Amino acid sequence: MNESKRKLMIAGMTVASVGLFFSMARPGLAQPSDTALIAKAKLIHARVLKLDTHNDIDTANFTPDCNYTMRLTTQVNLPKMIEGGMDVSFMIVYVGQGPLTPEGFGGAYRQAIAKFDAVHRLTEKIAPDQIGLALTPADVLALHKKNLRIAVIGIENGYPIGNDIKRVKEFYDRGGRYMSLAHNGNSQLADSNTGETEGYLYNNGLSPLGRDVIAEMNRLGMMVDLSHPSKGANMEAIRLSKAPVIASHSGVRALADVSRNMDDEQLLALKKNGGVIQVVGFASYVKTDSKERIEALAKLREEFGLAPQGGRGGRGGFGGGRGRGDEVTNRACPVESASGPPTQGGGRGAGRGRGNAGLDALSAERRAEYEKRLAEIDAKFPPAGRATVKDFVNHIDYAVKLIGIDHVGISSDFDGGGGVEGWNSAAEAFNVTQELVRRGYTEEQIGKLWSGNLLRVWGEVEEVSQKLRKERR
């Protein structure tokens, strides 16, 4: 093992020897008091490298007068990263799915370039003394050594490349280090998870261009992201990729049965590939209502002539809170006031649907009957309630037990999601570490979860790229 790879494998782990100070809690042994546990967690949190693989951005917050040096109402900004001890933010070039036409591709491309430019503006002009852009895992470690926060660029949705595979290299050259081939809605490259629930799969997995894009990403050293494409597209991507893949912000479907989460078959395939799932702290993917409740609510609404409404919450308004594209509109800079409301999640919502929309159309008598029936459903199938950090770590636990500690990481989907009680902004990141310590994870394991596994995969993707480029000479 060469020295550079060794450094990447230990990145995010303890600076001092793990075993000298703490040992993993074991059943039957006395657990530390809350005071001791918090003290232990604080030391670990300070020593490991903390990396979040998915933070959406709004170009309006990357200007000289309004930017991440300020404590904005955004879930991620430099003051909140510093407060929560977060070191690395993958800032996302996201473009929502649109028509598969030259006009649609052109508009998506312009939106993507505006977001690339925004991140470069932050790291090169607005705050180069506070945050730097990393293009390699080695850059991450070097910037961290300089006590700087670190930005990395991820691309959510391959839609903006249109039908021009040369744009994959252009996006790589602009700093993109991972890309998902679809978002919500089938793209020209891959089917979306939404196609599973809607019963419409445009490509039956990956398109021929999508397969070529994966090969090009492997050649360049860009990580293939499985979050958002359909299961069929993901299984095909894992099969085709010559490098380890990632799921940048997904949950466990066994614990929250939504199409955006990964089932056991996908997780096991990801493990075999050598990849990593970055378990997401988006409430709607962490904790869902039971199938029985969802079905009962749907049946009740149909009976009363009301439009369908998901009992899971968080599906409406996918575009809200995800950030502007190529236009920066005039609006007040969203600086957070000391007495203002707490940071909120993105526009997709994180609450549970209770099934009471559209009741204004009912008569008073019918509405009373509806409310009575709804109360009966609530009693028989209680709503899930808001997701907590404990619920979030349950997903980590499940994935670790199924595929091993080396294939699991952490992400938030902040400023496009969030909503988990106790971890709803970068400022609250310590609460995740504290819960991991409470569960008995060691410092080495927590380092792997927060950053070590992702950096290992990224490094291996680079190695595959170097090998493929040599073979093509």
Give, region by region, the residue ranges found by the protein language model.
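Active-site-adjacent beta->alpha loops and helix N-cap segments on the catalytic face
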Residues: 187-195, 205-206, 230-240
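Bacterial N-terminal signal peptides that target proteins for export
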Residues: 2-14
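Histidine-centered divalent metal-coordination motifs
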Residues: 54-56, 228, 249
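N-terminal hydrophobic targeting/anchoring segments and the immediately downstream early-domain regions
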Residues: 19-203, 253, 257-473
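Substrate-binding cleft of carbohydrate-active enzyme catalytic domains
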Residues: 212-226, 232-236, 270-271, 394, ...
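Alpha-helix-loop-beta-strand connector modules within alpha/beta enzyme cores
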Residues: 202-217, 237-247
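His/Asp/Glu-rich metal/cofactor-coordinating catalytic motifs and the adjacent surface-exposed loops
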Residues: 239-249, 253-255, 260-261
